[in-house]
Amino acid sequence: MIKNTFISFEEQKEESRGSVEFQVFSFTNKIRRLTSHLELHRKDFLSQRGLRKILGKRQRLLAYLSKKNRVRYKELINQLNIRELKTR
């Protein structure tokens, strides 16, 4: 399952659960779980709403991290295999 792929990252970050990287990591896990759930249950609109809320939170955290520390942002993006933010 998805949880098993990120165990090493989670063990590494267990002492710093409040860090931006750990929060983005946990939101990414939730997003992947909800996405697989919604593939089976297409009409679960409350889960769709929750997914959109989590996506927004992760997007705001990634924007913050990209402004504060671009190197850590790039490493996190590559490690979690997610796309970069769209810039205006």
Swiss-Prot record:
The keyword Lipid biosynthesis does not apply. GO terms for biological process: translation. Pfam families: Ribosomal_S15 (PF00312). Keywords: Chloroplast, Plastid, Ribonucleoprotein, Ribosomal protein. It is found in: Plastid, Chloroplast. Its main location: plastid. GO terms for cellular component: chloroplast; ribonucleoprotein complex; ribosome. GO terms for molecular function: structural constituent of ribosome. SMART domains: Ribosomal_S15. InterPro entries: Ribosomal_uS15 (IPR000589), Ribosomal_uS15_bac-type (IPR005290), uS15_NS1_RNA-bd_sf (IPR009068). Disulfide bonds: none annotated. Part of the 30S ribosomal subunit. Belongs to the universal ribosomal protein uS15 family. This is Small ribosomal subunit protein uS15c. It comes from Capsella bursa-pastoris (Shepherd's purse). The gene is rps15.
